Amino acid sequence: MWRDDLPRFQPSHCRPLTVFTRPLARLIEQFERLPGIGPRTAQRLALHLLRQPEEQSRAFADALLAARQQVGQCQRCGHLSADPICDICRNPERNIGVICVVADSRDLLALERTREFSGSYHVLGGLISPMDGIGPEALGIQPLLQRLDPEQVEEVILALTPSVEGDTTSLYLARLLKPFCRVTRIAYGLPVGSELEYADDVTLARALEGRRIVE
């Protein structure tokens, strides 16, 4: 039964008070900067770390700093590597005559999971996007061209996302590469605008197998 003598709460139009101390709020803010991490997930991650023993938190921080300081780019293909030349480029069993071009290392790792490609890679570091001020000169295109003759490249596979930026980059590269080698592009088994890293292994394997020559 409702009692009229009890105080009633009115909707507050005031800005809510900060519920986290500043150090915790800063940690949450940093997690929110990560791709795919929303406010709630950021809070869960931050609170989880604080509940762990201090040595685990230190190990996490040390691993993060070590990766940031020691991991760079392969001088040949642009993939992430702790050495001047990455493991893939050093592998004598890889076919250096076939280069698969990807936008970034996440796409490379997705293709490697399929175990269907035994050639080499080249990481552009992005896609041509005039709207974002990213032109061809900002990408690793020149190093790709420099690999064609020394490595006797016979085919370049364009494994770029089916998007406006991916199509623009593919057309630009095809025009540059076709005088020197065969240029193919992975089949469109991927939804338009989708990212390669989110595609399942079977879809990626079929996209590689069904690649087509760029006219």
Curated annotation (Swiss-Prot):
User: Where would I find the Toprim domain in this sequence?
Assistant: 97-191
Concerning SUPFAM superfamilies, the annotation shows:
Recombination protein RecR
Annotated coiled-coil segments of the chain: none
* GO BP, sorted A to Z: DNA recombination; DNA repair
| GO molecular function annotation | DNA binding; zinc ion binding
State if DNA-binding is listed as a keyword. no
Q: Membrane-crossing residues?
A: none
Its keywords, alphabetically, are: DNA damage, DNA recombination, DNA repair, Metal-binding, Zinc, Zinc-finger
Q: Which Pfam families match?
A: RecR_C, RecR_HhH, RecR_ZnF, Toprim_4
| Superkingdom per UniProt | Bacteria
Where would I find the C4-type zinc fingers in this protein?
Answer: 74-89
Database matches in InterPro entries: DNA_Rcmb_RecR, Rcmb_RecR, Rcmb_RecR_Znf, TOPRIM_dom, TOPRIM_RecR
What the record says about family reads: Belongs to the RecR family.
Q: Which PANTHER family match?
A: RECOMBINATION PROTEIN RECR (PTHR30446:SF0)
Described function: May play a role in DNA repair. It seems to be involved in an RecBC-independent recombinational process of DNA repair. It may act with RecF and RecO.
The protein's name in its UniProt record = Recombination protein RecR
Gene for this protein?
Answer: recR
